[in-house]
Every structure is written in C-alpha cells, then in structure tokens.
Amino acid sequence: MERSGKRILRLHTADPVAFGFQPPESLLLDVHRSLADSPGYCHPQGLTPARRAIVQHYRSIGVPRVDIDNVYVGNGASELIFMATQAVLEDGDEVLVPLPSHPLWTGAITMAGGTPVPYQCDEQAGWQPDLVDLARKVTPRTKALLVINPNNPTGAVYDRTTLLGLAEAARRHRLVLFTDEVHDKILFDDAAHIPLATLAPDLLCFTFNGLSKAYRVGGFRAGWLLLTGPLRRTTPFAEALNALAALRGCPNVPAQHAIAPALGSSGGSAMALPGGRLAEQRDLAWQVLNDVGMRCVKPRGALYVFASHRRTEARIADDRRLALDLLRQEHILVAPGSDFGWPAPDRLRLVTLASSDTLTDAVIRTSRFLEEYQQ
C-alpha cells in the first residue's frame, strides 16, 4: 500500500522515534565517543561497565542480592526472553501468563516447549491480576509465573497488594518468576512501579528491562536480564544462561555504551508527568475513545490503550480480518485483541504515541468504520 503512495498510520507498534520522540542527545554522544572502542567482541554476558551500572541501578531501588555475575546484556530484552525461557523450560512445562498478554512471551514459551496458561486480569479493577483465577490455573506442570508490569497491552500498573499476592502464589507453588518491566519509567498520575524482585528475595526471579521505550533507542537493541534469588536455585539456571550467552557470541557492543548514561538519567519519566507529551496523548486517546463509545480503562503506565468495540461484536467473527479491513479502507494499522490472547473479537490495541491531531483523527475514523462494518 505504501509503495502505491498510500500513507499508513502505524498505531500497532510502540517505536517512539517513529512518532518524533528523540533519544537524549547526551546518550547518543556517549555512544558516538565509544565507537572506536567497540569493534571487537566483548564478554558473552556484556561489557563490565554496562553490567556494573545495571547492578548499581537495582541496588539503588532496593533489589537485594544483586550480583554482576547474574546480569546479562542482550540484543534487546526480546533476545533475553527467548534465552531465559530456553534455560528454564522443558517440554510440557506450563507458564502462567496474564490475559491479555504480549505475544512475544507466548511465542517464546511455546518455542521453548512450554505451554502458556492464561490467568485473568480484571478490567473492572483496572486490569489488576485476578489472584483467585490464577490459583485455579496452577497444575503439577506449572513451572513459572509471568508478570508484565506496567502491562502491555492494558497499561495497568500493579499495586503492592497485587504484587505481594503474585509473589506469594509463586512461593506457595515453588514457581520461577519472570517479570517484564520494560515500561517501568513510563508512569502516569500517581502510579508507582514496584520491582517485583524487591518483594521476592527468596524466590528465583528473572527481571527484564531495556532502553527501547523510556530512552527511545529501540534500534540500538540494548536490553538486560537480572537473575536474583537464593544461590542454590540461581546456579543451575545461570549455568544454562551462560551457555546460551556464549553460543550467541556477545551482545551488540556499541549500544552497550548507552546503558550506564541512560540509567543515570530520567529517561521518559518527565514526558509522562502532567503536561508532558506522553501524558497529554494518553489523556486524549482515552477521552476520545470513550467519547465515541469505544470504552477503555485509562492506562496508568506504558504506551497503549486496549479499547473495546463491543457494540459491533455480533457482526464480527475475526478481529484480525477486522484489523486488515481497517488498514485497507482507512489506512490505519492497529493490533487486534487476539494478538494478545484475548478470546473475543471485541478489542483493539492502539499506541498512544501519535500527535494529538493524528490520534483524534484515527480514533474518529476507526469508530465510523466500525459503525458500518460487518463480516
């Protein structure tokens, strides 16, 4: 379509740079100055200065027992998610995943031979995990529990009580914790992010983060994994991760020089404050969606809205076809709810990074399209 001259509004993926958000100039300068030192391979787990900066960061926010030997830098958090699931899971193992959940995780779990088992998140409670439903989903095959906080696609930020409940569920059933915290600096209103590892020092916890969202350098592919917990439990998984890290050679060296300066800055947190661009566009997207009847919970973090269009559900059987038809007719690209495991064809995820005028136009056009649409 673009080759034929059509302009596509891409509201399906959260690349801040594509919407005019620029990374901190000081971060780019640090990387540029380090290029002459970057042509060679580095340690399979990453550069020591980058890993030291990660250790210092997590110690400063209260994560106990942070050891540089259990820090892994990767080509984005995505690579490390695949490595971790390969290291932890055996064929037939089950992983409890939030519903809705990011497809990267369900894909990585499946590729590692595991089975994603969704636990419900309660829309009426701001998409907080339903701990009762989670308890029902535990079986003898359950190996791990995935927490995505702030959540993609819902924008939920989990409160302390919920996180303590999740940690207790993992403790009771001796589960490995996977915690995806890549949006931890993009918070709105009075939302506060609590690292799950601070509440579960006695549990084996894999914490994932990176520079793509808050620091607007997704193309750098710079992410990290922190492994915490009792030494007797971390050792076998660290050995597996070490082997996988060695197999890939090493992570991208130039981008690692961005990690230390990034962790010493505020990232995208200022833009998420009231009056900041991220906050204004979150407010606008939520307001316009509700004004046109596409109900959604107001996100408290991250870069997305997970909107309902239930008034048209009776006329829709396939939400992926809906998304494709919206693209063909209106040239608006969004992600259907089924991409996130949502069972009904009544949800769309939109990225809130576009300008205010563009977001308003996109939501109004999508609403008009849905009024007449049927399959």
State what each model feature region is.
Residues 4, 112, 172-173, 203, ...:
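Helix C-cap/helix->beta junction micro-motif
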Residues 111-117:
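A short helix-loop-beta submotif of the ANL/AMP-binding
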Residues 201-276, 286-289, 370-371:
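Conserved core segment of the aminotransferase class I/II
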Residues 117, 122-193:
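Active-site phosphate-binding strand-loop segment of PLP-dependent enzymes
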Residues 260, 276-286, 296-310, 344:
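Conserved glycine-rich beta-strand-loop-beta hairpin in the small C-terminal domain of fold type I
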Residues 87-109:
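Conserved PLP-anchoring active-site segment centered on the Schiff-base-forming lysine
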Residues 1-76, 83, 133, 262-265, ...:
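N-terminal small-domain helix-loop-helix segment of the aminotransferase-like
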Residues 60, 315-318, 325-334, 340-375:
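PLP-dependent enzyme catalytic core of the Aspartate aminotransferase-like
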